[in-house]
Amino acid sequence: MKDFSNFLGLGIAGNFALHLDQAGEAEDFKDIITEDEAAPKGMFPFYLPCKTESASKRPRPILSTYPLSSQKIQLPREQVNVQAEPEVGLVCDIEYKDGLIAKITPTHFGAYNDCSIREAGREKISDKKNWGQNSKGIAQQLLDIDKFTQGGIMDAYAICSFLRRDGKLHAYGEDVELNGYSYFYEKLTDWIINQINTQKDFGPLEDIKSYIKACNY
């Protein structure tokens, strides 16, 4: 697996219909209002490639611990429920202009496990997303993206997931085509650019732009 320790690790909350309800996170986002009812609720950091120093308790220091693994998921030391969250992961190039993100170009994709702590009441969504090394799963080999638009390679792929227990495979969730995301392709990258540039510290969300600046990205 390629080392992504110099990359920013960001996730999207609520880009599938009813996903937040299924993940037990709908209550966390009850006060987040979006212009488009189908739009994702926001973004969260799961890995920051620097050690940030802040007068506040955010971002949490644990976010500077590299969490990705293609071999295993290490459960938290604390006694909490953990759930697998099958997703597609994107590797992207980012261009900046005047201190803001101006362009995002997805270059590779692969299976991704946005493994999360399932526990209500955590202050920020990122509090559930990184508890140390090996807390996120990613494919051993990623695939090249020919074009991040309809008609490209990603049209032919879907997300499916299985859990192995006692030597038996069990289907986990429903098979969903990648273009089944509420926002995808240009609609998604446009939304990400705007969200990172404008998202405030509110409710379960954090000021990601300030984190990026602190990491000199």
Regions found by a protein language model. Name each.
Residues 5-212:
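Glycine-enriched loop-and-adjacent helix/strand subsegments that border the catalytic/binding cleft
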Residues 213-217:
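Conserved catalytic-core subdomain
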Residues 1-3:
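A short acidic-Thr-Gly-centered motif at the start of a beta-strand
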